[in-house]
Amino acid sequence: MSLVCSVIFIHHAFNANILDKDYAFSDGEILMVDNAVRTHFEPYERHFKEIGFNENTIKKYLQCTNIQTVTMPVPAKFLRASNVPTGLLNEMIAYLNSEERNHHNFSELLLFSCLSIFATCKGFITLLTNGVLSVSGKVRNIVNMKLAHPWKLKDICDCLYISESLLKKKLKQEQTTFSQILLDARMQHAKNLIRVEGSVNKIAEQCGYASTSYFIYAFRKHFGNSPKRVSKEYRCQRHTGMNTGNTMNALAI
């Protein structure tokens, strides 16, 4: 089972360059680190202790806390917490990493407690949920952040810290492609916009299309009807619904 993230307990202060940015980490500070950037901390391992969290543990935690796995794309890659009882946390991590860890339920509660340290940190749930989504789900979340953006495969790879060839391979394993995910997301957004926005030009722009004519072509190919035809159908449905409502009110009178 692959790791989603780690909780790191710093016992000696150190300075580090993480993702091309300089940081100063203090003695007693606690970090939650996305596994995608865990390798950036490897040169400083002598300065901290850690415990890793796999997908099963994260999923159970999210279920127990009743949290929906709806995320914002491109979350923070690590979180910082302070004012934590360091002595207790040190003992917890030591136990969880020891061979004496033979009480599953107790160990699970300790793991959940370590995660909950970051519950009030901005980006906490996003970091966790992005770690348990499928690769296609992660890509979908990223493009949904700003569908008007002219997304390229490289942009997604930069967000996920993954090579283009590996991303293509993983998406193929999930029987999809970046282009298909982007198209589906844009078309769904366009269909939603048509309900409230009358201008096809504006809808095309908000869905990331520089050419309105190409947007109309893509929309027709995807849904079998033009944007104007779908918009007209929505208006008719609303009008019919309003008339039905008025009739019912009249009958009630």
UniProtKB/Swiss-Prot annotation:
Induction: Induced by EvgA. One of its GO terms (molecular function) is sequence-specific DNA binding. Residues 137-233 form the HTH araC/xylS-type domain. InterPro entries: Homeodomain-like_sf, HTH_AraC, HTH_AraC-typ_CS, Tscrpt_reg_AraC-type_HTH. Residues 154-175, 200-223 bind DNA. Keywords: Activator, DNA-binding, Transcription, Transcription regulation. Induces the expression of gadE and mdtEF. Could also regulate the expression of other genes involved in acid resistance. This is HTH-type transcriptional regulator YdeO.
